[in-house]
Amino acid sequence: MHSVMETLFSQLIQEIGEDVSREGLVDTPKRAASAFRFLNSGYHQSLDHVLNNAVFEADSEDMVIVKDIELYSLCEHHLLPFIGKCHVGYLPQGKVIGLSKIARIVEMYARRLQIQERLTKQIADAIQTAVNPRGVAVVVEAKHLCMMMRGVEKQNSVMTTSSMLGLFRKQSSTRAEFLDLIGRK
């Protein structure tokens, strides 16, 4: 028995002129459906689930940064991947997040149909909601296959987006320190 998604992938393969019963394609609808579910698994997660009580009391007020978090997502316009990295910083105000949870927050929002601008803001808003810090900074740098494989076909372009909340938005020196520490000036 095929899932609706498997049937749709089978129809898609046939629509482009391929024979879905060909040896190399027989199991492709099943594999593609499984991959698509995985790539969009973020819809079935919540911030509370991802945090899993890993928010801790802490006296630290110094900047916390996790940089070079690898990410991939699907562009909501063409369903093609964009691949890059995310840098997250925040200024604690009595609470910190378990280190791995920051990467999991990035992953939760990246595993949805996205535009990079929204992804960046969702990550920042989630950190803000999780620990109510004095500020949050998120920078995402990514290559978009929708721009590399089709359309203008530019292979080396990188899109950079940022979301700055609290002191990162209000204080240029705080923002500059973050950008310097992640290697962006």
Swiss-Prot record:
Q: Where does Zn(2+) bind?
A: C75, H78, C146
Pathway field? Cofactor biosynthesis; 7,8-dihydroneopterin triphosphate biosynthesis; 7,8-dihydroneopterin triphosphate from GTP: step 1/1
Read off the NCBIfam families from this record.
folE, PRK09347.1-2, PRK09347.1-3
What InterPro entries does its record include? Answer: GTP-CH-I_C/QueF (IPR043133), GTP-CH-I_N (IPR043134), GTP_CycHdrlase_I (IPR001474), GTP_CycHdrlase_I_CS (IPR018234), GTP_CycHdrlase_I_dom (IPR020602)
Keywords of the record:
GTP-binding, Hydrolase, Metal-binding, Nucleotide-binding, One-carbon metabolism, Zinc
Keyword Coiled coil tagged: no
Name by which UniProt lists this protein: GTP cyclohydrolase 1
* Documented EC number(s): 3.5.4.16
GO terms (molecular function) for this protein are:
GTP binding; GTP cyclohydrolase I activity; zinc ion binding
| A Pfam family | GTP_cyclohydroI
